Amino acid sequence: MSSSLPPSSCDCFVSLPPASLSSFVLFGKNSDRPRDEVQEIVYYPAASHPLGSKVKCTFIEVEQVRETLAVVLSRPAWLWGAEMGANEMGVCIGNEAVWTKEPVTEGEALLGMDLVRLALERGPSAQKAVQVITELLGEYGQGGSCREEPEPFIYHNTFLLCDRSEAYVLETAGPYWAAERIVEGARNLSNQLSISVCPWSEHPQLRSHALQQGWWDGQGEFNFSVVYSLEKQPERMAAAKLRYRAGQELLRMQEGHMTVKSMQSILRDKESGICMDSGGFRTTSSMVSVLPRSPHEPCIHLLSATPDPSRSVYKPFMFSPRVTQVPWVLSPTFGEQDPVNQIPRFQTQVDRRHELYRQHQRALEACKGNKEAEETLRQKQLKVEEENLHWVDTFLDTSKSADPVGGSDIFRICVEKELALYKETGEK
């Protein structure tokens, strides 16, 4: 039996001009997952693949394409896909769990997180990425356990996708889906269907299926979120509605003034539950992206790589010809002995903590119970982050004439600086 207990939260945000202070598009996401799950930051360069080859995703294989784009991913270390990420063309995607009237199935298929990675690798624009996901959804379906436990935990997915000029919300219920296009203003997602009437695009049988199931009479206005949402929502899904409204209000308060810092402050908001830690779940990783309108200006992606953004540091990553994987945010691998590769799956646990995660955890433990030490560590973290953001601001101001290789080492440098801080704290 699959678990029907949804996680407490997951929140995605996008801000386009005129909601953004500058001409940039801003993307943000908190990944809220089982509290002990580790997320790693993984970089994959662009690649060419043999005709007719396949790619092994978390549970199943799919047909590979000839060319894949370079991607940076924030992902639970046990799976193939990603909770959120970006590609070299400036496309950002985040996914969220959703439960609808369409039942989940027990069989293994593509995880929503697999679809995130596949769309980033294959989608040079947000619109193309929507097409990639819907085509794969139709061919392979979605399903499979989404956490490292023997009891399956299965859900369907919603996605927020954006690029330098526009954004899309893609919401699914089994194989069925609806999409909304956003060209200005701000939008958020919080573990629920939110597309109402007149979707930008939809599954060709979306309405006829609802009619056959008796969810819609075919006469009144077709409202996707009303027709496909569960009539009796679990308690935690009711909490998602409150978070959704809180997210809308936080976006409204920043309307016309949204910056990287204000997006970070939204993702760090504890009162709303957007930055959460309850019921066995917490924010395990966080991401903010800055997407300039001009294709000649590089996009910058800020990643935490550690749990709880209110006690973490955002570090800038930029695609460039010389960028390489940073080992200290990469989890160990276990090959065929990995519990995800054993049948039955997830009968044992392994330690997936990467070096930054370990040192972050150690520093927090060293300060635990000592308010002065906790505040000192937080102020040092904020100072490091302020230096990181100063680099971002400076680079964006000068990037029109800058060589993109100038940012190839910035993520590595920032991770090393953060590691040094935690090691110093943990040794005291």
From Swiss-Prot:
InterPro entries attached to this UniProt entry: Peptidase_C69 (IPR005322)
GO terms of molecular function: cysteine-type exopeptidase activity; dipeptidase activity
Gene3D superfamilies the UniProt entry points to: Penicillin V Acylase, Chain A (3.60.60.10)
Recorded superkingdom: Eukaryota
Pfam families from the UniProt entry: Peptidase_C69 (PF03577)
Active site: 10
GO biological process: proteolysis
The family this protein is said to belong to: Belongs to the peptidase C69 family. Secernin subfamily.
Protein name: Secernin-2
Organism listed in the record: Xenopus laevis
Underlying gene: scrn2
